[in-house]
Structures are given as C-alpha cells and as structure tokens.
Design a protein with these regions (language model features):
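Bacterial N-terminal signal peptides that target proteins for export
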Residues: 2-16
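Compositionally biased, proline/threonine/alanine/serine-rich low-complexity intrinsically disordered stretches
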Residues: 9, 26-58, 64, 213, ...
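Bacterial N-terminal signal peptides
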Residues: 14-24
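A short, Trp-centered hydrophobic/proline-enriched beta-strand micro-motif
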Residues: 61-78
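Extracytoplasmic
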Residues: 64-68, 82-84, 90-94, 101-102, ...
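An acidic-aromatic
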Residues: 86-136, 198
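Flexible, surface-exposed loop/linker segments and immediately adjacent secondary-structure boundaries
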Residues: 121-160, 164-167
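Gly/Pro-enriched, hydrophobic low-complexity segments
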Residues: 146-147, 155-227
Length: 227
C-alpha cells in the first residue's frame, strides 16, 4: 500500500510538472543544448514600463511562431529525483509526453481532453483541456499577459525571466520561465508548499509534420513508445 501511495504521489507530481512543461513548451526555439538555470541574484533587474512590455511582446511573438515541436526533457523533482522523456507538440491543443523507463507515465492531449496513463497503477486520469494550464497556450493565439497573471519580468545579461501564476486563482504556486537569446532554456515550478520542480530541455526541433496518432488518448492506442 505504501509503495502504491508513493507511486500515485509521483504520478500526480509528474502531471503537475508536465502541465508546467506544456505551459512553456510553445516558446521553444531550435536548440541542441540542455537548459541552463539562473539562480536568483542581486544582478537580476526587474523590468518595468516600456522595457517590460517590449520583453513580453518578444516572448509572445516567439510563442505564436510555433506550430510543431519535438524534443527531450528532464524533470527534477523537489526530492532530487529525475525523470526524462520525449515530448511532441502541435498547436492548437495537441501534446504528448512520453517518460523513459522505469517511469510508467504517458500524458496526451487530443485537443479537447488531457489524459494521463500510469501503466504501473493501471489507471488513466482525464480532465478537460480547458480546465488545465495547457489551454492557455495551445490556442490559436497566445498572450501571456492576458492568459496568466505576470508576477515579475526580470533580466540578467542575455537572460529574461518571466514569473507567472494562474490568473483564475484556482491553482496555487508560480512558474518562472527562463529565456536566452529568445529561446526558452528552462523553467521552475514552485507549488503552494514551496516545493520546486525543474524542467530542462534538449534536442528541440520544429518538424514539418507529426503523426496525428501521437495525440490519440492512451485508452485508444497502445501506451508503448511511438517512433
């Protein structure tokens, strides 16, 4: 029973982390480098007024330029545990996150529903896309200022950091996106308890097309990895 509870807790943590991954994924530009994380420091300058608006406009433009993405991700949990996998994204509305073994999770959005399949627990959790953070960035038009509550926009050297929270107030915690040269490199999610989950990226490309079968819900197709 204890093992099952621990597995369930990790599964739900993964779902939250992937929701955060999806929140940021459309901003990815092509890069083969893993993410670099900036620690908070006195060198961070908070942007205000015209500078803030200009930075957000540039990020929104990059977000809206994306049609399809695929690449690798590494998720680091609050306890230091790590999981990696492949992700696929096609706007509007479609996502797929495949975790490498020994993780047993598959998360798919088909444009209307987000489903998480855990093969170890033999469970599938579903929720409407519109009720998740994914709906904020998978539509035809992305506007971070409108879709989320921006807490802070800051800069250090060539890095721009955007910290945001759910505008509706239904989800506690914050996400900090870290951009360099217009490309998203990493982000941290901090929940209501202060627990931090980090996502880093590598081998991100913009394919000309993706197999639509990647975005079928896991109850319909095999949860095995598709190539």
């Amino acid at each position: 029973m204890r093992l099952r509870q621990m597995t369930l807790m990790k599964t739900r943590l993964a779902f939250a982390a992937v929701a955060a991954l999806a929140l940021a994924a459309p901003a990815l530009a092509q890069t083969a480098r893993p993410a670099t994380v900036i620690a908070a420091s006195s060198a961070l300058v908070t942007l205000e007024g015209a500078e803030r608006a200009q930075a957000l406009a540039a990020i929104n433009a990059e977000l809206n330029s994306i049609q399809r993405l695929q690449g690798r991700f590494v998720q680091t949990g609050p306890d230091g545990s790590r999981a990696a996998g492949d992700f696929y994204l096609q706007r509007p509305g479609r996502l797929r996150f495949e975790y490498d073994a020994p993780a047993t999770m598959l998360i798919v959005s088909d444009g209307s529903v987000v489903a998480m399949r855990d093969t170890a627990l033999r469970t599938t959790e579903r929720t409407p896309l519109r009720s998740t953070p994914l709906s904020l960035i998978l539509g035809e038009r992305i506007d971070l200022e409108r879709n989320a509550r921006i807490i802070r926009v800051s800069r250090e050297g060539g890095w721009t950091l955007v910290t945001a929270r759910d505008r509706s107030g239904q989800t506690d915690g914050t996400i900090t996106l870290q951009f360099n040269g217009g490309e998203l490199r990493s982000w941290d999610v901090v929940d209501a308890t202060g627990a931090r989950t980090r996502i880093t990226l590598s081998n991100v490309t913009r394919p000309a097309s993706l197999d639509r079968g990647l975005f079928r819900l896991p109850d319909v197709v095999s949860t095995g990895r598709r190539r």
